[in-house]
């Protein structure tokens, strides 16, 4: 799949200003949260308290996650997806909208630690949303990362964008999606599925399908950011869940 580059959009201050104004360490996973997640899992599922998870305990974890997976509609009440506006919001003024998507096992709060739109929104005057994926994942591609494949996140995120447009004065020519790892995969999925809404995407360490079923109906700008030494979503491409994902360059 090829996305046409429109320099006037990629060069927009809303994107360049946000990316260049903040220091951050790019990684495909939130390393800071890994020990915390493991400790919580051990406390809950390590029944014999031997510090290890045997197969029965691992199966209990898998069942725990799968119980809450039904459909995007059934689980919508579990999502946190508040739309945030600047303190001095003026309904007569058009605002850019940024949708930022967390990585696998993350959530909206963790994504805002990675990309602090909550602090930047006042400075750059935009509206944003950092929603939660069901069970901390997005059903983006066959490789990453909803293991059940039953949540229609593409439909859900489209409805979220339309909700923002209905409730606030959103500039339809400045609708941006950014995401980390699994969220980056989802940003590519949204650019493909909803090119009528999405102006540009900025994926961090996330790609799309190895083979796209079609091109998007409208051109979407892409600013792809990826570490060449990323060991999770590899620069040169690889496989997850017996499915392939493309290299950053081929993507």
Roles of regions detected by a PLM:
Residues 12-21:
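Bacterial N-terminal signal peptides
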Residues 30-44, 58-60:
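EF-hand Ca2+-binding helix-loop-helix modules
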Residues 46-50, 230:
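Acidic carboxylate motifs that coordinate Ca2+ or other divalent cations, activating on Asp/Glu
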Residues 51-55, 95, 233:
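Glycine-aliphatic tripeptides that mark coil-to-beta-strand junctions in extracellular
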Residues 55-65:
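Amphipathic regulatory helices of Ca2+-sensor modules
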Residues 74-176, 186-189, 193, 236, ...:
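Serine-hydrolase catalytic machinery in alpha/beta-hydrolase-like enzymes
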Residues 165-167, 172-220, 231:
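Primarily recognizes the serine-hydrolase "nucleophile elbow" in alpha/beta-hydrolase
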Residues 224-226, 230:
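Short beta-strand/loop motif that positions the catalytic acidic residue
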């Amino acid at each position: 799949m090829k996305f046409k580059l429109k320099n006037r959009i990629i060069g927009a201050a809303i994107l360049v200003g946000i990316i260049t104004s903040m220091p951050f360490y790019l990684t495909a996973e939130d390393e800071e949260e890994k020990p915390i997640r493991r400790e919580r899992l051990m406390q809950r599922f390590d029944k014999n308290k031997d510090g290890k998870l045997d197969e029965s305990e691992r199966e209990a974890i898998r069942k725990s996650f799968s119980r809450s997976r039904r459909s995007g509609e059934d689980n919508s009440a579990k999502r946190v997806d508040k739309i945030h506006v600047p303190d001095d919001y003026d309904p007569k003024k058009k605002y850019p909208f940024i949708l930022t998507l967390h990585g696998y096992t993350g959530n909206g709060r963790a994504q805002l630690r990675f990309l602090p739109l909550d602090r930047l929104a006042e400075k750059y005057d935009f509206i944003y949303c950092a929603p939660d994926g069901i069970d901390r994942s997005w059903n983006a591609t066959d490789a990453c990362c909803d293991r059940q494949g039953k949540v229609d996140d593409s439909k859900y995120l489209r409805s979220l964008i339309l909700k923002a447009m209905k409730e606030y004065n959103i500039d339809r020519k400045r609708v941006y999606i950014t995401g980390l790892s699994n969220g980056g995969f989802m940003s590519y999925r949204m650019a493909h599925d909803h090119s009528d809404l999405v102006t540009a995407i900025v994926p961090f360490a996330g790609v799309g399908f190895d083979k796209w079923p079609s091109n998007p109906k409208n051109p979407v700008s892409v600013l792809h950011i990826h570490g060449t030494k990323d060991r999770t979503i590899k620069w040169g491409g690889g496989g997850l869940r017996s499915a392939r994902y493309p290299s950053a360059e081929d993507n």
